[in-house]
Amino acid sequence: MLQRKLGKRIAELRRARKLTQEQLAEAVGCSVEFISLVERGVNAPSVAGLETFSRALKVEVKELFAFEEKKR
């Protein structure tokens, strides 16, 4: 569940910066396939990878986890 929310947040931040998955992959130093897996919540970056994603997206690491919780 957290992995899925993180992936959606990364995709949201990427789109807000008008980056393609290819551009983000190049900035992060990974494959486009990995970016796709992360954004779909199938895979998650390592702790070190979170720092790399945050630099590429020009946000603090905590901003990667700034997603809204749904009220039940």
Can you say where each PLM-predicted feature lies in the sequence?
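Short, conserved catalytic or interaction motifs in soluble domains
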Residues: 40, 59, 69
